[in-house]
Amino acid sequence: MYATAHFDGERINIEHRIYAVTPNGDRQYIDPSKDLKIDFWRYERRFARPLRDRKLDRIRPILGMVVERYPTFTELQVEDYPLIITRQGPRKAQRQVIAAISRAEVEEALK
C-alpha cells in the first residue's frame, strides 16, 4: 500500500523509453501516443517493463505494432530515465540502455 523508502544517493528509475534501432544505427523513439496509441501508464506498465524484463509473450500485440511501424529495426533498446535522491532534492542521473532485444527475439515471440 505504501511506497518503499528511498535514501540519499539512491538511483530511482522514473521512466523508460524504447528505441527502435535501424540497420545504420539510428535510434527512433517509439512514442506511446503517436506510434502505439496508448497513454503513458499503459506504455510503462504494459510495454516498457515487460520488454525490459524480456517477457515478450505478454506484449505480442504491441510488438506487432512496433514491427508494422518500424519494419527495418534490428534491435529494441530500453533506456531508463533516472533520478538520484539527494538531501537537496532529486537530480537527474545519466541515462543508460538497460535492455537490448534483438529483432530475432521479437520475431520468435510473434510466432
Predicted regions and their residues:
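Extracytosolic and intramembrane catalytic regions of membrane-associated proteins
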Residues: 7-111
